[in-house]
Amino acid sequence: MIKNLALQTQFLLLILLLCTSCAQVATTSEALRAPKAPAQYGVDRFTTEQKHNAHYVEVGEGPPAILIPGLFGTYRGFSRMLPLLAPHFSLIALDNFGTGDSDRPDSDFGYTVPEQADMIVNLMDELKIPQCTLIGVSYGGMIALNIAARYPNRVSAVVCIEGAVIMPKPSPYQFMEQGLDTPLLGDAIIGFIRSGLLDTVIAKDVMGYAWPKMDAEDKAEVKDIISHYTDAASRQTWLSLARALRTSKDFTEEAKVIKAPVLYLSGDKSSFREMTETNIDYFKNYLPNVSLVSFEDGIHDLELQKPQETASMILEFVAPERSRALASTTRQDGQALPGISHNDQYEKAYQ
């Protein structure tokens, strides 16, 4: 997630001077049927049997796994993990509705967690996938848990990177909502975002604690990923996405019956730590078999910060027989790397 973007007040004067015409992006009826930029890893695909058009990238061999990005992110947020997971899974890396090359439904879609969840289940139907692993980050983790709660027979396992059953309160995007809800100002903000001038600022915000410790190559790679988040931004869609955490209801009762194994990954240095701790408490009380893993130096977007460690955890949890290919991320005695803490349930699964 992009948490502090709306607080970049030092740029407001420049925003107001921008031409708003550059902020116009095609909506559903005008959506492109080909990606703006081809996938660097995998094959671009589009759904064909749904009312709205969803874009995804397909790569790999093995049991199916769907990767669900965060709120304003695209499938490219998983770019650093795709080469690590592709030898072990048939991966479907999504652009959620409203992001990347997927459609931007308007009047008939609110971008809530359940709506995005239904889109993914429809995609599974179209691809004739009866059951699969769901890997989601942040908003994508919320969607994954929602599917597991509402469609229990469609989910074999869930890997949730700082997602939630209990939404963050107050919404971290309330200031963004206010800005985007004003047409002239909102179009100017989106124009500035799409210009690329804020890509470095946004990358720093996303990476937070980890940014100063990254080398130049990693920073450039993350900035490139972020640039694909922002170049498809539109005012109405990003306004709806910003509202999504407020308009999506907690699904605490439904989640109590989740039967699929769940691995919950979090970072102690995350800017959403309060939200993750609230949800960790919920899991401990109502879903004690959820495997909880915390990275001591981890941020919110572990898929960007720690792709190899995260991929290794996913393999060890979902497909332990395949995990030896990433054994370099663990010590020879089979214990987790230093800086990782986990509950007893996961220790038993990990050894």
Where are these predicted regions, by residue range?
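An N-terminal hydrophobic leader/cap segment in hydrolases
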Residues: 17, 21-45
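Active-site loop/oxyanion-hole signature of alpha/beta-hydrolase fold enzymes
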Residues: 50, 93-135, 139
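Conserved HGGG/HGGXW glycine-rich cap/lid loop of the alpha/beta-hydrolase fold
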Residues: 52-103
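Short glycine-enriched nucleophile-adjacent loop
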Residues: 141-152, 158
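Flexible "cap/lid" loop of the alpha/beta hydrolase fold
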Residues: 149, 158-192
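Conserved alpha/beta-hydrolase catalytic His-Asp/Glu region
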Residues: 170, 192-256
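Conserved loop-alpha-helix segment in the C-terminal half of the alpha/beta-hydrolase fold
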Residues: 257-298
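Catalytic active-site module of serine/aspartate enzymes centered on a nucleophile-bearing elbow/loop
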Residues: 287-351
